[in-house]
């Protein structure tokens, strides 16, 4: 696998990977080391960590069901992992998921998509802490997209937009602290 460590799903979202996947592996001595005999991939685009986790679990289950008979009959070819393609997926820190108006709208949306109940995307709204549960990019070329100043939250047509260094993103769901 490309990502090894505590948070591979969140890391692939934060880094903007197009695809991710699962591997059927022999257990090695290190984290996610060992040869693999089967792999399957799926698209990352637009999925949050919970959705991607579920999709990968289903994909892994299907791959295992397909691979087990081949393993039992010794019909698999084992492939050594290319260590040069490996990236460490460190545990997500709370600071990494704090929304930052000086970052791009895309980076902030990725923070929201990579977040979870245990590591939420956070920001300050009217001086109070809040979790941003869902967000999406907006098409700035669209005439309906509002111009929002960096660091400002703005409501247009019943929708909430957060201004960033390169435009804005739409805040779709918020959970205030203590709720």
Where are these regions (language model features)?
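Donor/substrate-binding cores of folate-linked one-carbon enzymes
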Residues: 1-88
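A generic structural signal for well-ordered coil/turn residues at beta-strand boundaries
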Residues: 18-21, 32-33, 38, 93-95, ...
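Weak global preference for isoleucine
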Residues: 9, 13, 24-27, 31, ...
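Active-site-lining helix/loop region of Rossmann-like oxidoreductase modules
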Residues: 66-125, 131
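Short secondary-structure boundary/capping segments
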Residues: 14, 28, 89-91, 122, ...
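An anion-binding loop in the catalytic cleft
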Residues: 101-179
């Amino acid at each position: 696998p490309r990502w090894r460590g505590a948070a591979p799903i969140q890391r692939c979202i934060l880094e903007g990977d197009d695809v991710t996947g699962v591997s059927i592996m022999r257990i090695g001595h290190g984290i996610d080391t060992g040869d693999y005999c089967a792999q399957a991939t799926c698209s990352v685009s637009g999925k949050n960590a919970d959705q991607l986790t579920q999709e990968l679990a289903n994909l892994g289950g299907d791959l295992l069901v397909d691979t087990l008979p081949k393993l039992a009959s010794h019909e698999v070819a084992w492939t050594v992992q290319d260590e040069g393609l490996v990236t460490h997926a460190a545990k997500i820190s709370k600071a990494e998921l704090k929304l930052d108006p000086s970052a791009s709208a895309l980076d902030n949306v990725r923070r929201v998509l990579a977040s979870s109940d245990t590591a939420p995307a956070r920001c300050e709204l009217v001086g109070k802490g809040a979790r941003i549960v869902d967000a999406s990019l907006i098409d700035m070329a669209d005439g309906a997209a509002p111009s929002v100043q960096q660091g400002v939250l703005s409501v247009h047509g019943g929708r909430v937009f957060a201004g960033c260094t390169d435009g804005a993103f739409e805040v779709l769901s918020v959970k205030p602290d203590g709720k």
